[in-house]
Amino acid sequence: MIRLPDPVGPPISLWLVNLDAPSSEAGLHSLDALSASERARAGRFHHAHDARWYVARHNALKLLLAAETHMHPKDLHFVEGEHGKPYLNLGSPLHFNMSHAKGWALIGISTEAAIGVDIERPHPMADWSALAQRCLSAAEWEDLMTLPPGQQLRAFLQCWTRKEACLKALGSGLTIEPGTFDAGIEAALREVSIASVHDKHLSSVVSIDLPMDALAAVAWMQPASGL
């Protein structure tokens, strides 16, 4: 597991995990710390590499949370919020989030703010512009179209990671359309206003530099903001 530089903002530890690391590394491929439901989920994957990656990323998350809570990984049990975001039912403010893409996982942990992370591996997309028009705000689409064609797909994927991170920090699931707010196609730190049915929420998002070909972002909710 690779500890990444802390982002500008509240204390957030970020970890990059190679899910294809040797089986001896930190017990990432052991089933011992997984719950019965996690083991059952791992057994339902059709492809062996998907099951292996699932086990590895859940073990990595539990190992990191165990270090934060001084608990054994086996004793950590997740509960889901209203829209499916996992939490630890410990009665203490420990926030975490995880994202994965093609053999890698990104994990964020904070004691001060609800957070969200997202990682994407660049890949060819036949009709990505149609998807971008549905997912980007009008301002983001306009900014995207000012870039040279060869840079547009990567910029769209970068924007997508920023939007995903914001929505995961908010814990809103799919109840908010990504095109209804601006997260920006640039990598810089940005404040983001997100309107839900009953309220308006303020988050911050910044893109993350990774030591491999991937795009990633971390977002955190501002005080007194969130569902």
Feature map (PLM): residue ranges:
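Core catalytic alpha/beta fold that binds nucleotide/phospho-ligands
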Residues: M1-L227
